[in-house]
Amino acid sequence: MCGIAGMVGCADPHVVRRMTNAMIHRGPDDGGYWFDHEGNVALGHRRLSIIDLRHEARQPMWDATGRFVLVYNGEIFNYRNLRSQLISKGYTFRTESDTEVLLNGFSHWGREVVHHLDGQFAFAVWDRMERFLFAARDPLGIKPFVYAHHKDGFLFASEAKALFQAEASLSAPAYENLSYYLSFSWTPHPLSFFNDVAKLPPGYLLEWKDGEMSIAQYWDVPLPSEDELRPIDADELYDLVRQATRSQLVADVPVGLFLSGGLDSTGLLECIHDAEPPVRIFTATYGEDQREGDVFEEDSNYARMVAEKMKLPIYELRISPDITRDLPEVVFHLDEPLADPTIIVNYRLTREAASQTKVLLSGMGADEIFAGYPRHVAVHALEFLPGWIRRSFHKISTLVQGSFDDRAMSGRVRRLKLLAAHADKDAFLRFMGFSVFFQQDEINRLLLPELTGIQPANTYDVYRSLYQDGKGATLLQRLLYLDQKLFLPCLNLENSDKTSMANSVEMRVPYLAKALVERVAAIPDQQKIHGLTRKFILREALNGRIPDAIIRRKKTGFNPPVRYWVRNNLKEYLHDVFSSRSFQQRGLFDLRMVTKLIEDNDNGVKDNALKIWALLVLEEWHRVFVDRSPVEPRDEELVFCAPPVR
């Protein structure tokens, strides 16, 4: 994994060095840049050495002809196979790196190279002969790629903070996207929370030539029609998962794994527990003192049981509730505000793991492809109930509204209450009810009038247009399509990349191997949700291979006890933040509504913990990116990468 940056049509070697060094955390091992006055282009690269650790694999990298120069972030897991193909076609190699395979692959296949890649990547190639830039982002959006127009040219990078080194005004907030953040806790691509900064969507290509930019989609999340669905045998699925997982062990450094003790991460470990050298396992623990009001099972107990069964050592990290010291730094590395409380867990775990490994495998993505979230089974199951039962369910929920202390509810009861509140709506609106932090009417009351006028008419529309694209598919297929198109890349993968790369650790997600995603998309609904059992076929594939307790265990993930944090350790800090002059003078929110959110949460009238957390993250974001000038990058020496001598 690395950090890439570039300027086309507005190139300045001093600026591209600053852009590159703004991402030194993404690549502390090495750095390089290249500048071509004739083509008015500059490229920069920070390297985290994982495959072929020698300096010969440094970037920017040139092909043997001197025509193409590449900067690349990611891993190509099938690079050895591609290398053999290219050698058979007459290509020679100076290194053992996947970078050179990608470079020669582009030289041979051109734009079609993306269809040959099995990996996670974002890259850009400059063609010196045709004088155009070609860039691409991987199919699922595992690696980031942001860009902006600047003067008469074009800027791109792995992180937005690099772009600010070229143009400080790009860091201005895009307040017209504020309601997206309040609704979803993230901003949907291609939009961002920064003024005039865009995100290249997953599975897209970008070209820049003669001052003109164009983008095109080369891959989309599969959305098969009902008659295209094909059942899968449990053993066949296990083989696919095992193949995807073992293929991602390729590295010249130690590999580790995030283990929650849940089905997904335990399944990965089962596939590679006999690997040589052994993988290193990391898990999080919160302790009994943080469980009040957050009824969940301690992940570490299950993770420890799995590690013992597989005879592997495990490293446990206690996540303390004292998070105020880390939060500003995490927000800085995220670039955009993300209101998922797991940002703290992921950041601390990768920081701890960084002393022992540069690569971590994660079970992320399994929920989105196998239907693992409560909203999947809730929305799906309600479709089988008559309308009068759904309406009655909703009516009962309105009668008991406010009768119970929300703070005392378990997560399952909270979800049941949420389901009942939306039971009388159509499937799409039920799904959205499970997918948002603030409802649209809450946003309208929360924002000051001068902001409501510049917001999108309805934040749901970004989901609705994709939902309507799937009219020939089953309801469950359409819901999974939405999650894979938006929730997965815009929140989970963004969170995963930024928090891990902040600590110079590469995160790999085997469940999102393209071949696995495409095959699982074609599995019938009843193999994903069987009765009320989620991820049914994955459980069947792992049955007898991992402990029964894990097969039967309900989903928990790495979710931290945010309700406990908000009511206890963060309470005084929250008071200081929301009563501060900076927060009250932002001119964003009706302060009476903010006060009511907090009071209702404290009194148990409503569970507003996640909403309060979202407002806290947003204020910390303002303090990092608005109140302070952009952080100056470290002045690290970069090597000038010259073309090969011909």
Each model region followed by its residue ranges:
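Acceptor-substrate binding/catalytic loop of class I
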Residues: 336-338
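Adenosyl-5′-phosphate
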Residues: 1-4, 165, 169, 196-201, ...
